[in-house]
A protein has these predicted regions:
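NTP-dependent small-molecule kinase module
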Residues: 2-28, 126-127, 189-232
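Pre-Walker A (Motif I) flank of P-loop NTPase domains
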Residues: 29-33
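Hydrophobic anchor at the beta1->P-loop junction of P-loop NTPases
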Residues: 36
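The conserved Walker
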Residues: 40
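Conserved lysine of the Walker
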Residues: 44
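Hydrophobic positions on the alpha1 helix immediately C-terminal to the Walker A/P-loop
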Residues: 47
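Conserved nucleotide-sensing/catalytic segment adjacent to the nucleotide-binding pocket
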Residues: 54-58, 63, 68-116
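ATP-dependent NMP and nucleoside kinases share a basic, alpha-helical "lid"
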Residues: 118-177
Length: 232
């Protein structure tokens, strides 16, 4: 678990640290968000849980199945749940703004199995100066969070496409997310597209890395260091 209350210290993150700047320990730390993205099945939820930080699940901002604006997979009748058009970015950003401003927000509870919202719940992060917002579309709101001064870091988890495929399929079957034929069609499509997905997230401002480096960057944020500009 990361300690968000200790004063800034040397960052364990790897690579060039020129995009980090220290925050004074003598004044209260403003609440900021780490946007955690990556291909479906890349380990975002597991990493978030391991960090011990509060987590906003961006998957809960999916549109419902009867929304006429939902996109379709090209050449298919399947809804394209991997398109940013299937997701309510404005509502997600509004929730992040509320958490950074007041430490509390109401979020939808979304069932992926039924593609519907089943209720709402309160997410209260209290005085915690850092939280994670994780989901496959997190990179799509990097620029907006950066412009509002809310961004601590943006991370894209990267791994082997074959490993991601196996992890994603096992999870989706275990949770009964969709039918097996749908999961297989989606899984093969995403495995072939995975390198392009990571490249897109990087172009949107997320730093692509494996789990250990991601944990190091989270620790740097928890120590009071944040990005001054989006990563190249």
């Amino acid at each position: 678990m990361l300690d968000t209350n200790r004063p800034p210290e040397a960052s364990p993150a790897r690579g060039n640290g020129s995009h980090w700047c220290p925050v004074s320990a003598s004044s209260p730390l403003p609440t900021r968000v780490v946007l955690l993205t990556g291909p479906s099945g890349s380990g975002k939820s597991r990493l978030s849980a391991r960090s011990g930080l509060p987590v906003l699940r961006l998957d809960d901002f999916y549109k419902e199945a009867d929304d006429p604006s939902l996109p379709l997979v090209e050449g298919s009748s399947d809804i394209d749940w991997d398109s940013p058009l299937s997701w309510d970015a404005d509502a997600a950003v509004a929730a992040i703004v509320e958490l950074c401003a007041g430490g509390r927000t109401e979020v939808p509870v979304y069932s992926i199995a039924t593609s519907s919202r089943t209720g709402t719940e309160t997410l209260d992060i209290s005085r915690t100066p850092l939280f994670i917002a994780e989901g496959i579309f997190a990179a799509d709101i990097v620029a907006r969070c950066q412009e509002m001064g809310l961004l601590a870091d943006a991370i894209c988890l990267r791994g082997r496409p074959s490993t991601t495929f196996r992890r994603r399929l096992a999870r989706d079957l275990r949770e009964g997310r969709k039918s097996l034929p749908f999961l297989l069609r989606r899984g093969w499509r995403l495995m072939r597209a995975e390198r392009g997905i990571v490249a897109r997230h990087t172009a949107l401002g997320a730093h692509a890395c494996a789990r250990d480096e991601a944990l190091g960057r989270l620790a740097a944020c928890a120590a009071g260091r944040h990005r001054t500009t989006a990563a190249a």
